[in-house]
């Protein structure tokens, strides 16, 4: 971390639908495993405290009250965890139900990031239970505490100013204008996504390209944690397809249908350097997104990611041949223009 490498984890847990305390126990267990692996940013799937597939059970008051108690337990567990943790849950506020990602650190709930885009097509019908999040974050009263609630909340490490994290939820990144765009423009260098993206033929490839593209477009790290086995299969099947990407490159990807935890390191110093050099990546002059501080220990990071000895030479032979042909064609076209001009 002292050299700019931040270890992150995307974790799929073994959930039981509507069994809040089983899910709480699994989240706490996997959180400790991620911390033991050195992760400073830990991301869990969408609605993982209850399961994404609770359907009309989401409207039951007893479930929502248990969610609050379980979230308090998970938050307390972070008091002994040097990490910023994102956990998905349903949250009832002012008579409305929202799909949120809670940010937890040092025993506290720092904020609730709301889902902006609710899918209501095909196999999805989230508008049946949930309300779309507000356009701007506001402060709400939650269990006697004043906590930020809304989209595009920025979480900044008190010990490392350049480490700014923001979250979005599943469908948000599939939308025409994801919330992460504005968050990145205001300084977020790592983006977390608590997701429940189902499996259909070919969707995994599209998902990979989507996450790669978003990390490249925003010159950022992207940590994508997906729901997996344990969800109801009445309408859909989830594969636990977790992805960690950095500036257009996938650093780590989970084997689908295995409920894995993946861990890798994101080089935020490199990302910051690339943003400074890229004049088209304009940060906003008027900053309006809310910011909350979190705490981590700044220490050496043990690297698990690999670095190619020949970074400009693709290891894949087909890609290498394509690259060589491209180089020759670029040179040939340049030479052709020169010869035509001088003769």
Map each language-model feature to its residues.
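Enzyme catalytic cores with a strong preference for nitrogen-chemistry domains
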Residues: 1-343
């Amino acid at each position: 971390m002292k050299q700019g490498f931040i270890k992150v984890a995307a974790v799929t847990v073994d959930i039981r639908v509507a069994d809040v305390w089983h899910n709480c126990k699994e989240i706490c267990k996997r959180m400790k495993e991620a911390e033991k692996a050195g992760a400073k940013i830990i991301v869990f799937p969408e609605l993982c405290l209850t399961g994404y597939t609770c359907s009309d059970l989401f409207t039951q008051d007893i479930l929502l009250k248990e969610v609050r108690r379980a979230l308090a337990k998970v938050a307390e567990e972070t008091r002994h965890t040097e990490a910023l943790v994102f956990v998905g849950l349903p949250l009832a506020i002012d008579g409305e139900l929202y799909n949120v990602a809670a940010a937890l650190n040092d025993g506290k709930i720092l904020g609730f990031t709301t889902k902006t885009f609710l899918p209501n097509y095909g196999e999805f019908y989230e508008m049946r239970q949930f309300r779309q999040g507000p356009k701007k974050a506001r402060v709400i009263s939650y269990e006697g505490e004043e906590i930020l609630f809304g989209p595009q909340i920025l979480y900044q490490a008190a010990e490392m100013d350049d480490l700014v994290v923001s979250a979005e939820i599943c469908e948000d990144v599939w939308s025409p204008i994801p919330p992460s765009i504005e968050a990145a423009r205001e300084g977020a260098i790592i983006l977390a996504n608590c997701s429940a993206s189902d499996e259909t033929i070919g969707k995994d490839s599209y998902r990979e390209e989507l996450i790669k593209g978003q990390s490249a477009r925003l010159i950022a790290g992207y940590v994508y944690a997906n729901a997996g086995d344990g969800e109801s299969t009445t309408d859909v099947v989830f594969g636990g397809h977790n992805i960690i990407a950095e500036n257009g490159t996938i650093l780590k990807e989970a084997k689908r249908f295995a409920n894995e935890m993946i861990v890798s390191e994101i080089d935020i110093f490199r990302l910051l350097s690339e943003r400074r050099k890229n004049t088209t990546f304009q940060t906003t002059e008027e900053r309006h997104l809310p910011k909350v501080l979190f705490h981590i220990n700044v220490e050496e990071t043990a690297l698990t990611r690999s670095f190619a000895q020949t970074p400009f030479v693709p290891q894949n032979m087909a890609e290498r041949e394509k690259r060589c042909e491209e180089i020759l064609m670029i040179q040939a076209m340049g030479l052709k223009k020169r010869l035509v001009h001088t003769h």
